[in-house]
Amino acid sequence: QAKMLCCAPSLSTHNPGATLKVAKRNERMRSAGGHLHLAVGSTFHGPAGADKKPTDNPDTIRFVNLLDILVGLPSVLLDRDPNAAKRRRVYGRAGEHRLPPHGVEYRTLSNFWLRNYILMSFVFGQARQAYNIWGSSKPHAKGYDIDYLPVTVNFDFYADLLKRVDMKSVARAINRNDLDLAWKLWDKVSEFTTEFNPHQGNGVNAST
């Protein structure tokens, strides 16, 4: 088992019901991941499967898709290691995640972002924005009207974002480390994030 690359299998939002296992004993390449552990509780945990572990639910799919768009996609722009695409043939593919007791583990990133504080801040900020978009896509109270009654916002920001970017294209850009495709998609994501939160910005542009 020590010769195997990776440990427990991952779940995939791009291939629901499948588990991703890595590794042949004779595979000589090894790589380090930079996984994001998000303490968001059991909101994203569906019913336990045959292995008594939680399965994905609709909220899981939405949240991990948002992480692919806002965290995984810009990682293609920032991490230009030529081995990234090779690594993702077997490990760290788009939509890879686990559901630990504390919430969600996003397993797509390499450890490139751990090299300095600026990159760490960017990744954490993008993950936070993904969570904010997920939460804002549900009906929620936002302020009060003139009669002090709650004003409910019922606009699906997630659905609006997916009208602008195709998830299959996002997965392709991540899995192939396709810089040109990633830039085309990121331009559309940037338009959305600027509208969603004009004070935060998108964090990555051609001069970054």
Predicted regions and their residues:
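Phosphate/nucleotide-binding catalytic core
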Residues: 1-208
